[in-house]
């Protein structure tokens, strides 16, 4: 019987897959910094309302004073730096190639969880993790058809910079999970309130960067109503829901296992891209998807 936190991590992966599909247009319209800033602001407002009115876990009162600093640091590392780096990479490489590089956050998380937190996983789960990551990378690396000339697959800017930005985003995601894990295992901590703190701190950092005059923080184009709606929907699905599901999963799950299961989002993205672009991925992509399914099953049934 799969553990609840495993299913929550897979749910986060589904949210991120859908969110990445929604993000391409508004991210390229506004630029990585402006898109992230608008997204964080909208999500922060949503999470504050949810914490004050809807959360079943106790709201702000559930957060002990000593939890605020690690939550703030986790937000700065994982959301402020990591989020911007990921969308900057996506703008340069497209969602497919940025996704395969970002999937390395699972490997970073497993190593950091072992070294820093002393987390151990069994042989079956380890084999499942290897197959899952291999499947994700196979599906994306070999998932592009030779005749695919869609704008989402085009290179924009320096490819090497895009690769480094995607790897930076992956490392930031792993570090943020490591930082926030001790907070989430504290009994009674509200994951929605914790998410609100993380996103609010990252939002303040974004606006401070804009106020400093940093040129890249300015939007490349003025936001339209349609772009803001897409940004808000993306934020609700990927950050509001996806990130909160990960925090709930971290209450009982290991950092490495949660990261591995949540990294399958690029494979879940394959059928969504098929629907969106009107053509199936290359046959090798389905081989990768098959490996991911087998690996995920080994983890769930460990």
Where are these regions (language model features)?
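Loop-to-transmembrane alpha-helix entry segments
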Residues: 61-65, 102, 115-138, 142-148, ...
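Membrane-interface interhelical linkers
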Residues: 1-10, 14, 20-34, 38-71, ...
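Structural signature of hydrophobic alpha-helical transmembrane segments
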Residues: 2-16, 64-77, 124-136, 190-204, ...
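Hydrophobic/small/kink-forming positions within alpha-helical transmembrane segments
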Residues: 17, 21, 48, 75-80, ...
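Juxtamembrane boundary at the C-terminal end of a transmembrane helix
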Residues: 251-252, 297-302
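Membrane-helix interface/capping residues of multi-pass secondary transporters
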Residues: 32-33, 95, 121, 189-191, ...
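Juxtamembrane helix-start motifs in multi-pass secondary transporters
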Residues: 35-36, 98, 194
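Alpha-helical transmembrane segments of compact multi-pass small-molecule transporters, enriched
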Residues: 41-47, 101-115, 130, 201, ...
């Amino acid at each position: 019987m799969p553990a609840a936190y495993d299913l929550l991590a897979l749910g986060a992966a589904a949210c991120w897959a859908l969110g990445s599909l929604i993000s391409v247009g508004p991210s390229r319209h506004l630029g990585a910094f402006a898109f992230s800033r608008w997204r964080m602001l909208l999500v922060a407002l949503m999470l504050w309302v949810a914490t004050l009115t809807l959360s079943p876990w106790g709201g702000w009162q559930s957060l002990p004073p000593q939890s605020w600093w690690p939550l703030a640091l986790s937000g700065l590392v994982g959301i402020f730096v990591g989020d911007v780096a990921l969308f900057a990479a996506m703008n340069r490489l497209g969602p497919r190639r940025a996704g395969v590089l970002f999937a390395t956050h699972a490997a970073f998380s497993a190593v950091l969880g072992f070294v820093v937190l002393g987390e151990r996983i069994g042989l079956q789960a380890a084999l499942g993790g290897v197959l899952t990551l291999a499947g994700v990378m196979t599906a994306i690396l070999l998932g592009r058809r030779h005749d695919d000339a869609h704008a989402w697959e085009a290179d924009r800017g320096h490819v090497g910079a895009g690769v480094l930005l995607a790897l930076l985003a992956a490392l930031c995601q792993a570090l943020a999970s490591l930082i926030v894990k001790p907070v989430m295992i504290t009994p009674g901590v509200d994951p929605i309130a914790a998410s609100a703190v993380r996103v609010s701190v990252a939002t303040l950092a974004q606006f401070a960067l804009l106020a400093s005059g940093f040129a890249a923080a300015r939007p490349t184009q003025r936001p339209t109503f349609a772009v803001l709606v897409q940004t808000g929907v993306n934020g609700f699905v990927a950050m509001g829901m996806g990130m909160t599901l990960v925090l709930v999963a971290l209450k009982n799950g290991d950092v490495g296992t949660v990261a591995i299961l949540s990294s399958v989002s690029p494979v879940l993205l394959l059928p969504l891209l098929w629907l969106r672009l009107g053509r199936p991925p290359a046959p090798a992509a389905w081989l990768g998807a098959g490996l991911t399914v087998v690996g995920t099953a080994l983890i769930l049934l460990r």
